[in-house]
């Protein structure tokens, strides 16, 4: 007499049957989504969240490495997927990750990275710390391209993004460099009696000193002029220094070209900006629309901010 199993309910269906019914439903939902809501065709790590949601509830099939798709655009390296079979892109620095090694929703951090709770939020306002990938080392490094990188993780990202550059570590610590002006002073105009400020941000190693000068004067500002002041501070990043020149209660004689000069033992760099001073009568007679070309130049600001992309920070 055949053996009868009575421990399962009559309407029990095998998991594979449930999945076979669920997948067509997911396909219908997918086709109804707007294009903007679908995952992009970018690097694999950008699509992984969608793939995990679609695969939720599925078990691991027998591992067939020859059927695995090759991951691409993996700037943080590769890790095995939840089933330990195929390779997938590891998470980058700053991306969400799984604190529990047995979990696999957000994904695993890449080479030289570890998953830590981000304590930078404001807990008093109810912000919940999030697990993020953090580089194990925070020591700056000098790359073979002559650039200084904040730590090994940034250098490895750059190396994987530019494979033909053969980027390697030359030595720990920053590269020795003559001053590089990261943020230049900008041309500006204002009315007599008002205040203006020029700023200048410099990266260098050894550290640079900054001074301000005005064309036509042989002295370093502020000199003995009580309505001109200068200020300096370190930062905003390592091996950077920022200087400001403030002119209070503008006078017509303040008009001219001002220069930020940065020096260290390896060399110097400079950047200039023009100050135009108008009287109220000139402003009314000229009209603001005609002065826009002599105001701040957005194109110069964008160029200054993009000059050192990829370097250090």
Curated annotation (Swiss-Prot):
The record's region (Disordered) falls at 290-313
| Disulfide feature | 60-83, 63-85, 68-86, 74-89, 97-115, 109-133, 142-175, 200-260
A GO term for molecular function: insulin-like growth factor binding
InterPro entries given in the database record: Growth_fac_rcpt_cys_sf, Ig-like_dom, Ig-like_dom_sf, Ig-like_fold, Ig_I-set, Ig_sub, Ig_sub2, IGFBP-like
Family matches, as SUPFAM superfamilies: Growth factor receptor domain, Immunoglobulin, Kazal-type serine protease inhibitors
Domain named Kazal-like is located at 127-177
Per UniProt, the ranges with Acidic residues bias are 298-313
Q: Does the keyword Cell membrane apply?
A: no
Where in this chain does the record put each Ig-like C2-type domain? 179-276
List the GO biological process terms: cell differentiation; extracellular matrix organization; ossification; regulation of cell growth
Secretion signal, residue range per the UniProt entry? 1-37
Q: What switches on its expression?
A: Up-regulated during the early phase of the bone regeneration. Up-regulated by BMP2 during osteoblast differentiation.
Q: Which UniProt keywords apply?
A: Developmental protein, Differentiation, Disulfide bond, Extracellular matrix, Glycoprotein, Immunoglobulin domain, Osteogenesis, Secreted, Signal
Q: Which residues are glycosylated?
A: 166, 190, 284
Q: Name one GO cellular component term.
A: extracellular region
Compartmental location: Secreted, Extracellular space, Extracellular matrix
Tissue expression pattern: Highly expressed in the spleen. Moderately expressed in the skin, lung and urinary bladder. Weakly expressed in the brain, tongue, esophagus, stomach, large intestine, liver and bone. Expressed in osteoblastic cells during bone regeneration. Expressed in secretory osteoblasts in the tooth.
What does it do? Involved in the proliferation of osteoblasts during bone formation and bone regeneration. Promotes matrix assembly.
What is the protein's name according to its record? Kazal-type serine protease inhibitor domain-containing protein 1
Source organism per UniProt: Mus musculus
């Amino acid at each position: 007499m055949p053996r009868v199993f009575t421990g399962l309910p009559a309407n029990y269906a095998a998991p594979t049957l449930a999945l076979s019914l669920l997948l067509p439903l997911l396909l219908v939902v997918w086709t109804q989504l707007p294009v903007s809501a679908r995952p992009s065709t970018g690097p694999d790590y950008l699509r992984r969240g969608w793939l995990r949601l679609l695969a939720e509830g599925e078990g691991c099939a027998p591992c067939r490495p020859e059927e695995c798709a090759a991951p691409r655009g993996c700037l943080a390296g590769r890790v095995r997927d939840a089933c330990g079979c195929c390779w997938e892109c590891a998470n980058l620095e700053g991306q969400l990750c799984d604190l529990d090694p047995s979990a696999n929703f957000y994904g695993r951090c890449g080479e030289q990275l570890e998953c830590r709770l981000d304590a930078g939020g404001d807990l008093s306002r109810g912000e919940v710390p999030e697990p993020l990938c953090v580089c194990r080392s925070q020591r700056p490094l000098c790359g073979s391209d002559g650039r200084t990188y904040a730590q090994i993780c940034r250098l490895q990202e750059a190396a994987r993004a530019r494979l033909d550059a053969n980027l390697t570590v030359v030595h720990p610590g920053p590269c020795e460099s003559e001053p590089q002006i990261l943020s230049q002073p900008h041309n500006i105009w204002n009315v007599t009696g008002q205040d203006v400020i020029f700023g200048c941000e410099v990266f260098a190693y050894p550290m640079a000193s900054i001074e301000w000068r005005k064309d036509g004067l042989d002295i370093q500002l502020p000199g003995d002029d009580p309505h001109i002041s200068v200020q300096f501070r370190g930062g905003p990043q390592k091996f950077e220094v920022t200087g400001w020149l403030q002119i209070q209660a503008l006078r017509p004689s303040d008009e001219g070209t001002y220069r930020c000069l940065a020096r260290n033992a390896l060399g110097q760099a400079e950047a200039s900006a023009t100050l135009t001073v108008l009287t109220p009568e000139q402003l009314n007679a000229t009209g603001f629309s005609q002065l826009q070309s002599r105001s701040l130049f957005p194109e110069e600001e964008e160029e200054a901010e993009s000059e050192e992309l990829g370097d250090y920070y």
